[in-house]
């Protein structure tokens, strides 16, 4: 029995805002609820509504910049930087810049629409 899993066909999450989301591990691909790993590309001028997720989220920026508003504090990360945002913290993710932002997001437990608690726009 193999002690590893290679993912070469991630689930591409349907979106309406131009953002690419490829879930490699998590609820949609491997039915794992303890962790999700996703590769994402946020287009220029993209943003999500504020949310208060019930999961920790780790983000690593591959290229470009990503803006976070965490409890009213604005933070901008660039390529090579990372952040951990603890669960039950109000946050907004965005890319208000002129170039796309590519990054990896890891959520524990796994990302789920039932746990994200997005505010109405």
Residue spans of the language-model regions?
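Glycine- and acidic-residue-biased ligand/ion/polar-headgroup-sensing regions
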Residues: 55-66, 71
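A short, N-terminal "cap"/entry segment at the start of jelly-roll beta-barrel domains
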Residues: 1-34, 118-121
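Well-ordered beta-strand scaffold positions
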Residues: 40, 65, 73-75
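Short histidine-centered beta-strand/loop micro-motifs
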Residues: 47-53, 94-96, 115-116
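Ligand-binding loop in jelly-roll beta-barrel domains
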Residues: 31, 87-113
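Histidine-centered metal-chelating micro-motifs
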Residues: 47-48, 67, 83, 87-93
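Short acidic-glycine-tyrosine-enriched beta hairpin
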Residues: 72-87
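Conserved short histidine dyad/triad with adjacent acidic residue
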Residues: 23, 38-53
């Amino acid at each position: 029995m193999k002690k590893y899993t290679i993912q070469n066909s991630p689930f591409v999450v349907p979106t309406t805002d131009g953002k690419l989301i490829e879930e490699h591990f998590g609820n949609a691909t491997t039915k794992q609820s303890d962790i999700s790993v996703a590769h994402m590309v946020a287009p220029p001028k993209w943003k999500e509504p504020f949310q208060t997720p019930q999961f920790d989220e780790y983000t690593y920026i591959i290229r470009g910049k990503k803006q976070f508003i965490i409890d009213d504090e604005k933070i901008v990360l660039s390529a090579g930087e990372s952040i951990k945002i603890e669960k039950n913290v109000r946050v907004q993710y965005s890319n208000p810049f002129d170039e796309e932002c590519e990054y990896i997001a890891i959520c524990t437990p796994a990302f789920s629409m039932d746990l994200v608690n997005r505010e109405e726009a």
